[in-house]
């Protein structure tokens, strides 16, 4: 559907942003046995849940809920990131807004890449510069925490696809959404 919309964080998708639309479509059309999708739960957003259930019908066993790290799980998730994840013996990288203070997550989490705060123009005007940037981020057996709004889906798809081509199948790329915003930005952006 080619219409202008603005999301909860103020990112506006214009009708002429065909690069964004194509890259988002590629990310949802991608299929691999180890590639999972997170969708809204029925109680949070019934129309979107139904849309994604239909869209992902062929890989429904690879679908989970995108609110896995929020609501009643948010405190557990934040505690895991801030303390327990230090013991994983894996590199953990953060990809997110240039305004996020990722150092508050702990010195065991490294910065992989920043995204302009409203990165839609970046992807609209310079999609290949963005793709070149992500293609240099391949550490074996690493965990990538991605909090880049709607660009997270595109970044994760690209990292996973290129990682597989490099036989780097053991890395995990996780869209953490806004689940750590109160730490990264010192403010609550959602009511979990």
Feature map (PLM): residue ranges:
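Gly/Ser/Thr-rich loops at beta-strand to alpha-helix junctions
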Residues: 42-45, 97-101, 145-155, 180
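Residues at the C-termini of beta-strands that transition into short coil/loop
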Residues: 41, 112-115, 177
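Redox- and metal-dependent alpha/beta enzyme cores, enriched for Fe-S-associated oxidoreductases
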Residues: 85-133
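Short, flexible loop segments at boundaries between secondary-structure elements
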Residues: 118-122, 166-192
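Electropositive, gly/pro-rich neighborhoods at or near active sites that engage anionic ligands
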Residues: 1-105
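A short acidic (Asp/Glu
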Residues: 48-50, 103-105, 152-160, 184-187
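Structural motif
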Residues: 91, 142-143
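A short, acidic, amphipathic alpha-helical segment used as a generic capping/interface helix at domain edges
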Residues: 19-23, 123-137, 151-153
